[in-house]
Amino acid sequence: MCGIVGIVGKSNVNQALYDALTVLQHRGQDAAGIVTCHDDKLYLRKDNGLVRDVFQQRHMQRLIGSVGIGHVRYPTAGSSSSAEAQPFYVNSPYGITLAHNGNLTNVEQLAKEIYESDLRHVNTNSDSEVLLNVFAHELAVRNKLQPTEEDIFAAVSCVHDRCVGGYAVVAMITGHGIVGFRDPNAIRPIVFGQRHTENGVEYMIASESVALDVLGFTLIRDLAPGEAVYITEEGKLYTRQCAKAPKYAPCIFEHVYLARPDSIMDGISVYKARLRMGEKLADKILRERPDHDIDVVIPIPDTSRTAALELANRLGVKFREGFVKNRYIGRTFIMPGQAARKKSVRQKLNAIELEFRGKNVMLVDDSIVRGTTCKQIIQMAREAGAKNVYFCSAAPAVRYPNVYGIDMPSAHELIAHNRSTEDVSKLIGADWLVYQDLPDLIDAVGGGKIKIDHFDCAVFDGEYVTGDVNEAYLNRIEQARNDATKAKSQAVSAIIDLYND
């Protein structure tokens, strides 16, 4: 999971890019990068760390130019090496930099094609560098000194023909402008908007609408599946459908966990979707246990708060904040490595005994993935004096790996894989476990008149929308990307890139 942003402005965009990445920090805390363009020269700064740590004053002063792109990263493919921080760069044609959110499922085939047919070299294990080289090659074969929007859209069409998976991309073509595009299934989110200044109109492309809001941009719309937007350095905007058979199937887990609640994705309010998740959970509890003895509903900060509030309201039960969060600790789900996650939970949360002592407590979380967080939190609730500890997941059981850019690649690291609800309840130490039903989740997110064909719910139902994911592929990525393998692969690769200081 990553966050991307691109801006075409009328003055230096370094501060705006920095601010946008800070707003998107929840999408990745492993690395950050910004590249800008001024007088056909590129200025890059990227490294491991949070946005505030990667960019010091001296770096910001060097990032000059009215056009630029940025990225925050959590690694799902490749490694956590700073060599794989984005944006990536290739010098031919034109000098192209690229930032990518998602994951390609045919990356091995593409890497082979790039080397044997396109005669290009890829220096890292990142599928983002592969995607960049595919785009660069398809633009190079147009053989134009000055590429037009038609050339750029033709190159994006070829990317769609060759690349399979979920991807949202923003790329900067030196001296020309920025291009954003979305995979033909619209799995990963991307939006664009504009703001009016005294010097003219400025444009932004970003992963989430909240980045536009905070910086004073007006949301124009989401990119459609397979669509591309090209904005020239002069501020001319072009859009084009570049996929042959687009299908609207965005990832439903964005609404469950990944996105900020104040974002609008594909015309859907994330906040409103989470309110409805709480309503659906309450209805299920009232159906299955109309005589429940829940005394208080307590959310696990922060994502579950919206659903928990509506759950309590619909049940007619008190809602209380029972945990104090240390806001200087990152999100545990997107922390590399199980050991880091376990250590982080106790550092991040502390129970308020007053809210637990002698009560039947219903804890609410957005989802249960590995079970690391909820198991420790349930134990904390018991230590704080809870009489009974019940647990509610606003999402259905996560039973299958995600292959489109979320860090759930290994099925055997998912606590619900091949286990019943009762099994999971025992493993996490809950007296009662309630999962959201998948039809209810789909209705909560997509209820009403929306343009979506269907959601990608692969982590819940094992149905992968790209149609190329089989057992052999899942076994291969499990071996390549489980926590044990990641721990062994953190050797630092050489950085072959722009001067980076």
UniProtKB/Swiss-Prot annotation:
Residues 2-234 form the Glutamine amidotransferase type-2 domain. Keywords: Glutamine amidotransferase, Glycosyltransferase, Magnesium, Metal-binding, Purine biosynthesis, Transferase. One of its GO terms (cellular component) is cytoplasm. Pfam families: GATase_6, Pribosyltran. One of its GO terms (molecular function) is magnesium ion binding. In the C-terminal section; belongs to the purine/pyrimidine phosphoribosyltransferase family. Catalyzes the formation of phosphoribosylamine from phosphoribosylpyrophosphate (PRPP) and glutamine. This is Amidophosphoribosyltransferase. It comes from Pseudomonas aeruginosa (strain ATCC 15692 / DSM 22644 / CIP 104116 / JCM 14847 / LMG 12228 / 1C / PRS 101 / PAO1). The gene is purF.
